[in-house]
Amino acid sequence: MKLQKPKGTQDILPGDSAKWQYVENVARETFKKYNYGEIRTPMFEHYEVISRSVGDTTDIVTKEMYDFHDKGDRHITLRPEGTAPVVRSYVENKLFAPEVQKPVKVYYIGSMFRYERPQAGRLREFHQLGVECFGSKNPATDVETIAMAYQLFNTLGIKDVTLHLNSLGNTDSRLAYRQALIDYLTPMRESLSKDSQRRLEENPLRVLDSKEKEDKVAVENAPSILDYLDEESQTHFDEVRAMLDSLNIPYVIDTNMVRGLDYYNHTIFEFITTIDKSELTICAGGRYDSLVEYFGGPETAGFGFGLGLERLLLVLDKQGIKLPVEESLDVYIAVLGSGANGKALELVQSIRYQGFKAERDYLGRKIKAQFKSADTFKAKTVITLGESEVESGVVKVKNNATREEVTVSFEELTTNFATVLKQLEK
């Protein structure tokens, strides 16, 4: 049997991983500007953490979760999304305590798992970065969090991303709309997909989220949830829109957007772009003011988003955005003869200790092959070290682009390599 990676997973190899690291670092620096700190939760959780919070009737729980019973007969699931584990951690670690500064702002970066049909930008193991803010009902929190994602896209140079916005209102608004949607969809029940016929009984808002053609036709003229917002919900949504306008963040109202998770209320949003004539959601989130209480904590407002790294990198590639990834070496040491092996190790280590990126030959190859490696590594400078250089304590350092050379002592290399580089830059 040929051993291969499981379907729907990928190996992120050197070169590609540098792009991932760059995007992750830009995200970290962006989140830090908004006073977010990193949180790391387990890759697997008790099944109930996900099923009860995400929703028993959602596709995630009914079709997509990787769940199993462990050797202690505990029902475990690999995490399919990031919010529920973070909320569980917030409650378990009592981050709601009065001595903890509010709002609590955290971000995460890590793998998520869903059993879906693999396609571009959507794998069974996918990587997500996300943020969660606990303790603020202020609509400014909604807008600040959306603005943070917007700033991240701008920093990365991504264009043609549209913010889709909607409100699910509070519980009363949602219940009123739920009944209106049932009244609208029931006469056309038989024309809905089998999944949506089930959703109509269990959670009719899910029908709006369906990707099936017959369901999309059915909901074209469905009532808008915005017509069922009570005064409190309408005020919150109006303030969110006004603040987005004040920050010059453009958006469109999308009344059919409900998000694929059951815990949202009030503001929900998605950032959507177009790839190969197909819409692609690259970031989505919203407000969830009951989830902390649902996990056994005190009444606590929450707002956050998740962003798929595979999708983000796909967009960067499709838009031709070249990431400023550092791929070159500061120096490559070509080694001639076994007598220079030990000294080559000393020199390359001392240069690394000074903060430079350095490599050397380990394979005893001919000098031409070593120079070719230096070119492949995009080495800025090359040092040729043989037994005669070891005896004299002096080497030539060559600028690999201009071919200019300087002669320096081992002491200069090991104590002040920066000065050596400056000599070659003149």
From Swiss-Prot:
Major localization listed first in the record, in broad terms: cytoplasm
Cellular compartment(s): Cytoplasm
Coiled coil: none
CDD domains, alphabetized: HisRS-like_core, HisRS_anticodon
HAMAP family: His_tRNA_synth
Record PANTHER family: HISTIDINE--TRNA LIGASE, MITOCHONDRIAL-RELATED, HISTIDYL-TRNA SYNTHETASE
GO MF term list: ATP binding; catalytic activity, acting on a protein; histidine-tRNA ligase activity; transferase activity
Cellular component GO terms, alphabetical: cytoplasm
Single GO BP term: histidyl-tRNA aminoacylation
EC number: 6.1.1.21
InterPro entries linked to this entry: aa-tRNA-synth_II, aa-tRNA-synth_II/BPL/LPL, Anticodon-bd, Anticodon-bd_dom_sf, His-tRNA-ligase, HisRS-like_core, HisRS/HisZ, HisRS_anticodon
Gene name per UniProt: hisS
Name of the featured protein: Histidine--tRNA ligase
Reactions this protein catalyses: tRNA(His) + L-histidine + ATP = L-histidyl-tRNA(His) + AMP + diphosphate + H(+)
Assembly with partners or alone: Homodimer.
Organism expressing this protein natively: Streptococcus thermophilus (strain ATCC BAA-491 / LMD-9)
Alphabetic keyword roster: Aminoacyl-tRNA synthetase, ATP-binding, Cytoplasm, Ligase, Nucleotide-binding, Protein biosynthesis
Highest taxon of the lineage: Bacteria
Family under the similarity heading: Belongs to the class-II aminoacyl-tRNA synthetase family.
